[in-house]
């Protein structure tokens, strides 16, 4: 399966039990900042934004004072899982990023999708990739 198929079929799909509800944007990004696959709506990000996210995975709390920036949008960092998941909130939407062995799985949402639904979609694929050694 191609990386783009993972984004299209496992991240940008309808959320279970909520037909028509899906993430706003999603991507799989290598830990070096290279985009492996993304939805057409995923924001163009700066290398330093991805570096900040990677630093927070290695040094939990790094982004808390400044917020998580992606594509010029600032998200307030909220509870995540140190070294594994970073979550951010902005208004009625937010972002979830799950670290795997080689990549980051990122999902961005807006209402009516809930933070929990975004977490479920992103973390399920991230856990699967971890199980596959990726």
UniProtKB/Swiss-Prot annotation:
A motif (Involved in PIP2 interaction) lies at residues 84-100. It is found in: Cytoplasm, Cytoskeleton. GO terms for molecular function: actin monomer binding. The modification Phosphothreonine is found at residue 114. Its main location: cytoplasm. Keywords: Actin-binding, Allergen, Cytoplasm, Cytoskeleton, Disulfide bond, Phosphoprotein. Phosphorylated by MAP kinases. Signal peptide: none annotated. InterPro entries: PFN, PFN_euk, PFN_sf, Profilin_CS. GO terms for cellular component: cell cortex; cytoskeleton. Disulfide bonds join 13-118. Pfam families: Profilin (PF00235). The variability of the residues taking part of IgE-binding epitopes might be responsible of the difference in cross-reactivity among olive pollen cultivars, and between distantly related pollen species, leading to a variable range of allergy reactions among atopic patients. Belongs to the profilin family. Occurs in many kinds of cells as a complex with monomeric actin in a 1:1 ratio. Binds to actin and affects the structure of the cytoskeleton. At high concentrations, profilin prevents the polymerization of actin, whereas it enhances it at low concentrations. This is Profilin-3. The lineage of its organism: Eukaryota, Viridiplantae, Streptophyta, Embryophyta, Tracheophyta.
């Amino acid at each position: 399966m191609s990386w783009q198929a993972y984004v299209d079929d496992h991240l940008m799909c309808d959320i279970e039990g909520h037909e028509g509800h899906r993430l706003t944007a999603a991507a799989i990004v290598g830990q070096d900042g290279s985009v492996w696959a993304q939805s057409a709506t995923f924001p163009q990000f700066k290398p330093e934004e991805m570096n900040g996210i990677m630093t927070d995975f290695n040094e939990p709390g790094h982004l808390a004072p400044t917020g998580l920036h992606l594509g010029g949008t600032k998200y307030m960092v909220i509870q995540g899982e140190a070294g594994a998941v970073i979550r951010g909130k902005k208004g009625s939407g937010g972002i979830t990023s799950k670290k795997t062995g080689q990549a980051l799985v990122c999902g961005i949402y807006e209402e009516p999708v809930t933070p929990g639904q975004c977490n479920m979609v992103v973390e399920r694929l991230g856990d699967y990739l971890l199980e596959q050694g990726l």
